[in-house]
Amino acid sequence: MKAISYARFGPPEVLEIGERPEPTPARGEVRVRVHAAALNPKDVLLRKGKMRWLPAGSLPRIPGYDFAGTLLDSAPGLPTGSEVFGMIQRNGGGASAEVARVPVGELAAKPSGLSMAEAAALPLAGLTALQALRDELGVTPGQRVLLNGASGGVGTLAVQIAKALGTEVVAVCSGRNAALVRELGADRVIDYTSEDPTAERGLDHVFDIYGNLPWPRAKAMLHSRGRYCTTVPQPGAIVRGALRRAGLHRAALVVVRSKRADLERLSRWVTHGALRPVVDRTLPWTDAVAAHEYLETRRARGKVVLTFDH
């Protein structure tokens, strides 16, 4: 099968475009013919060797977590040939190939109103936003939440999900992305190039998506019972997360989990017009090096997606 892989750690140029053996699904897994695979920062970190402490399998390795495609095997409630989307939980990934093996609990029926590229842009970023806002922060209608990094893959979905959950959204992004973020539903936009987001006070929640607003700076922005969540590990963040879930602390790290029920929740929002993924650019799988280079600029508005022709 056609696949993107790397046999050593390094810059985007270590990515190889070529043939790899088709995967054999284990018990509880199915094969998906991948039509589109979205990129995520985790792909970059693993390719660079920055997360070698994670059990991600041996090299060579096929990257990729987000996918949309068609089932080559039947899954519960989804016959062979069904259009599906999902996120592969295992650290080794494997979605950046013509065929991926996926646990049956990590995929769901593709929202009918989305293209394959749009559907592939939804899972990891959408699950991260949902699980941070709902589970780690516990947002409720009427609360005020600040989203730091509102124009990227997670951020564009977090704006919409926070609105769907009934909150007032204060979005932080650059001026060039302000119109997009307002269009997605933000109640107020802070242009970090001309305003200081940390001047905000009395917030119910701060969700640091971009990773440059650590807890020591963010806590002054919150009221006395306000909560903070980040996507980026910080010293003590995992411990604080456990304490926060026990009601003993106000800061947490979101660790995304691929769950069919949550994928279906995202899909329902899409169907009802409350959520749409934002795709910055779509490239053929053979342009994987260029796609990774662009993702590393951290300038993408929404997601970068690779497509496979079948």
Predicted regions span which residues?
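A short acidic, Gly/Pro-enriched loop at the edge of an enzyme's catalytic core
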Residues: 198-205
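Glycine-rich phosphate-binding loop and adjacent beta-alpha segment
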Residues: 212-275, 307-310
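Mid-domain Rossmann-like dinucleotide-binding core that forms the NAD(H)/NADP(H) cofactor-binding site
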Residues: 120-191
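C-terminal capping/lid region of NAD(P)-dependent oxidoreductase domains
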Residues: 274-278, 292-310
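Glycine-rich beta-strand-centered segment in the early N-terminal region that forms part
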Residues: 21-39, 51-91
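NAD(P)H dinucleotide-binding glycine-rich loop of Rossmann-like/cofactor-binding domains
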Residues: 65, 85-149
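Short glycine-centered segments of the SAM/dcSAM-binding site in methyltransferase folds
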Residues: 83, 144, 168, 226-227
